[in-house]
Amino acid sequence: MGQTVTTPLSLTLDHWKDVERLAHNQSVDVKKRRWVTFCSAEWPTFNVGWPRDGTFNRDLITQVKIKVFSPGPHGHPDQVPYIVTWEALAFDPPPWVKPFVHPKPPPPLLPSAPSLPLEPPLSTPPQSSLYPALTPSLGAKPKPQVLSDSGGPLIDLLTEDPPPYRDPRPPPSDRDGDSGEATPAGEAPDPSPMASRLRGRREPPVADSTTSQAFPLRTGGNGQLQYWPFSSSDLYNWKNNNPSFSEDPGKLTALIESVLITHQPTWDDCQQLLGTLLTGEEKQRVLLEARKAVRGDDGRPTQLPNEVDAAFPLERPDWEYTTQAGRNHLVHYRQLLIAGLQNAGRSPTNLAKVKGITQGPNESPSAFLERLKEAYRRYTPYDPEDPGQETNVSMSFIWQSAPDIGRKLERLEDLRNKTLGDLVREAERIFNKRETPEEREERIRREREEKEERRRTEDEQKEKERDRRRHREMSRLLATVVSGQRQDRQEGERRRSQLDCDQCTYCEEQGHWAKDCPRRPRGPRGPRPQTSLLTLDD
């Protein structure tokens, strides 16, 4: 009684401080609310078998990571820190995670694991389309061209232990049973040395035909970390398959941030990466913004040259990645570089640009919200993920949505207490209930026919009403004429019937007629008196 079921998700929430500390070691930041949302709502929709309560199964984590790192609109750059942190929990579990992690496969007898797979490949190979590993499906795209490694230099890298980054060591031939023995000449090397740039403390995943096992920092036969540089095909593919920093700083910043987090490059790697993906002016702007982000001992930005140069040097520093202090310097350097990329990608404050972002006719509300947030990041100094800016983002989302969606969102009850997530869900519901183009054409045609039928009916009714009115007026006129004639006839008859046969019509006396009436004037008629007209002389 009273017992609760512990799941991987609830376990991470109970040890959230440890999760944040681990994420900080990975040079990323994670938020608890987004952690729960991605684990319980987003990742189960990737159709890779991810449970809503989370899991520490490395295969499932790898499959989710592939989805997150997918290029283009199908990727999820905002979820990179969370899946990377979850992967770190599974590959290097702390004590409170170990009971939930599946037992690791037995380690190989020989340390040359990158050359030969120890067990059959997984049903779905844990590869990421972010990396330029060779895949059969990439041939369908004619542009841009994706280069593959020639394999010549990689054979030398995989058949002998290369020297460390700063401290040359004796060749591997002086050691017995070293892992750097040459591989047989008939065996083909792995496709790309950068397909799996993981930390040296992690065990390599199962090798397959599309995933390279050459790590940037790999433990050699003497237990020392070894350095693997970027390949030219990696840099070429990243440069030619992504827009420039000036054209789309958000997309290129997300790519470089993902590379910095997952590949853990050294100082030289960072300079090579920036020099390839950025122009000279863009690189100088990024470095300047990164140096502005350096903080002093009091936690506030500092301008002291010694502190700035110590944290973000412009010249090659003497940081030994084989030591903990050197790795800490590199982690801090990469964090400052990410901050410099984000700050340099922001344009001058221009709210008109934000207001100009409107939802397209066939654009989903989620995609529109992402574009709106990107405009906030690019053209304003505000962070759209900040809870204090949620009201502004919500109002912009309502006013700049499609007209039909915006009108319905404005009429929502208790709109003031609606969160941005509530508005997006309501907008998605309205968007999904929209009629198709065929339905819209059918509705317009039906409305047009109904309107014509209604107009025709109204015209017929008006014509009938005019006919009835005309008929009533004609009937009234005829009735008036007939009644007038009848009345005149009756009055004439009445007048004639009032005189007697010997009664005078002139004086109305009896005994004579009008021609013999003594009162009637006799004699010829005299001329009528002329009317005199006055003249001007009178």
Curated annotation (Swiss-Prot):
Gene3D superfamilies linked to this entry: Gamma-retroviral matrix domain (1.10.150.180), Human Immunodeficiency Virus Type 1 Capsid Protein (1.10.375.10), Zinc finger, CCHC-type (4.10.60.10)
Site residues, Cleavage: 131-132, 215-216, 478-479
**A Pfam cross-reference name:** Gag_MA
- Where does the record place the region Disordered? 111-222, 435-499, 513-538
Q: Keyword annotations for this protein? A: Capsid protein, Host cell membrane, Host membrane, Host-virus interaction, Lipoprotein, Membrane, Metal-binding, Myristate, Viral budding, Viral budding via the host ESCRT complexes, Viral matrix protein, Viral nucleoprotein, Viral release from host cell, Virion, Zinc, Zinc-finger
Query: What one GO molecular function would you report for this record?
Result: nucleic acid binding
Q: Where are the zinc fingers (CCHC-type)?
A: 502-519
Per UniProt, the short sequence motif PPXY motif occupies residue numbers 162-165
Q: Does the keyword Metal-binding apply?
A: yes
Q: Please report, in chain numbering, the residue ranges of the motif PTAP/PSAP motif.
A: 111-114
Q: Which GO terms describe its cellular component?
A: host cell plasma membrane; membrane; viral nucleocapsid
* Top-level taxon in the UniProt lineage: Viruses
Quick one: a GO biological-process term for this protein?
viral budding via host ESCRT complex
**Bias-annotated ranges (Basic and acidic residues):** 163-178, 435-466, 486-499
Positions with an attached lipid (N-myristoyl glycine) read 2
What stretch of residues is annotated with the motif LYPX(n)L motif? 130-134
Sorted alphabetically, which PANTHER family does this protein's record hold? GAG_P30 DOMAIN-CONTAINING PROTEIN (PTHR33166)
From the Swiss-Prot or TrEMBL record, give the protein name. Gag polyprotein
